[in-house]
Curated annotation (Swiss-Prot):
Protein name as catalogued: Probable adenylate kinase 5, chloroplastic
Record-listed ATP binding positions: A99, S100, G101, K102, G103, T104, R209, R213, I222, Y223
Family from the record: Belongs to the adenylate kinase family.
Compositionally skewed regions (Low complexity) per UniProt: 1-20
Keyword terms, alphabetized: ATP-binding, Chloroplast, Kinase, Nucleotide-binding, Plastid, Transferase, Transit peptide
GO molecular function, one term: ATP binding
Protein role: Catalyzes the reversible transfer of the terminal phosphate group between ATP and AMP. Plays an important role in cellular energy homeostasis and in adenine nucleotide metabolism.
Binding site for AMP: T120, R125, M146, L147, V148, G175, Y176, P177, R178, Q182, R242, R253
Organelle targeting sequence: 1-75
Lineage: Eukaryota, Viridiplantae, Streptophyta, Embryophyta, Tracheophyta
Amino acid sequence: MAASSSSSSPAAASAPFAAPGPHRRPGLALRPSPPTPPSSSLSCCRASPAAAAVSSVSATAAPNRGPRGMGLRCRASEGAAAAARKEAPLKVMISGAPASGKGTQCRMIVEKYGLVHISTGDLLRAEVSSGTEIGKKAKEYMDNGMLVPDQVVTDMVVSRLSQPDVRERGWLLDGYPRSYAQAQSLESMKIRPDIFIVLEVPDDILIDRCVGRRLDPETGKIYHIKNFPPENDEVSARLVTRSDDTFEKVKSRLDTYKQNSEAVIPTYSDLLNQIDGNRQVEVVFNEIDSLLQKICENASFNMLAKTNGKPQDSKDTTASKNEFRGIPTRLNNIPHSREIRKYFYNDVLVATRHAVEDKKTRLQIDINIPELNPEMDVYRIGTLMELVRELSLSFADDGKRVKVCVQGSMGQGAFAGIPLQLAGTRKILEIMDWGEYGAKGTFINFGAVGASEVDKEDDMFILIAPQNAVGNCIIDDMKAMTDAAGDRPVILVNPRLKDMPGSSGVMQTMGRDMRLKYAASFETCYSFRLLFYAGSFYPIMGALRMAYPNKYEIYRRVDEPNGQERYVLLEEFVEKPTPDEITNAFRPRKNENEKSASGFWGFLSGIL
């Protein structure tokens, strides 16, 4: 296969399945330890004054009957988790129009996560009443009926963010920044949230919430004539409308909010999460809470990796079934570096093992990084072989006998004998280095795809890229093989099972529905594919990932000012998202009745 040019380092261009040497195992792939239960309420970004010091990672020797002997299974201690929380306090920005329910959500966030709630209104009043230098400047403008300049407000916010309690507990910045200049000032000081939440409520609902409000001048209590009426006629008789709650003033405040929001949102587009605020308070908070929990989980794993002095590796330290540590960058540099390839091998391995441990028996792996995308001219068969070797050796470590199956040449018809794309891979597998522990021929054996290849001593089967081709439908052979395998796991690695024409050029219509149904019966345990503009492979716009037992995750690739890049989680789906759902994840949310637009945001229409 042809390899495209790249600017990657020489190490990145190393042979994709080079032997590791006679005195080394070809790849260490140990069994992940059982998942630990999550902490209550997942307040993992809330710092505790009594946080314990970092404890060392405890390792327990796990006896193993596989070819590579004993493996260590490590688990990070709770002390390390506490240190992670202390080092990575949660940082949240929240925005919402008047009467959007923002104040209520802020109270609930602070109550659960212990963040310091910072609003510019409160800051202004506190600074002015305290007579600080910043407060005196602000008072001068306010006394003269002028707006306080952006820089003065920013100085107040930055001063508050630098206080020990904020640095210890994290912060919730309420309604700030309100202008592009304020946002850029924070950016220039590298003050950036983990998430930017926007509460969205239709204009007519917002106006009704405000215009319908009534004030009890005796108690100061706020009522609403429809949503929260007074207790009795006596209270009702003394209610008054606040001067700010007329239709004209509410509409003016709403327009001002929209202008400010439109100016700020582009700065935080990669962190933006728009929440439907026109629901019950608890429902809105549950959605916000799930987003914050996700951030906390990711922060904990990153910090645990840092405290252990090395990148977290799922093969020797596993804290839960959600140990994902982010998507590697520079995936458009081909060939991929050894580090990137090993990263994906580990990611696939952990997800697959979780599925097998959960008694799943018909599994499918779909990984389309550039080196494994058959539609690109850089398809590297060695990368696929390395992945299969890692999977096989990992299960062999547990004493399982793995049959690795490769599809041969075409069978019947005019094209009989013509080799498939991967027809030579069995020979490659046989000459690869399988270590010095005698795995090949004992715990790992090779065969073709078919019922005759299923032996009673086989514990599981890995099928390498089974594919239908013109004149040859592999599905019938696969079905016979899985029937013979019974309840033993069968794992398909990058299958291509769409129906193809027969050797005469006529679609094989007989049994087509049954074949497609069988092909769809395999449960995806791992899926990763990059997202591009339609009809191209550059630039990378984002990624779609699923690692069992987690949901499908859509990520946006974001360019950093220093020439770096990162991937930001946009949305999650229980089922594999449709092209329209993926496209919509990359665009601001619209009314549910509006259809997805084509054009610029239709770039993902052909990816799946």
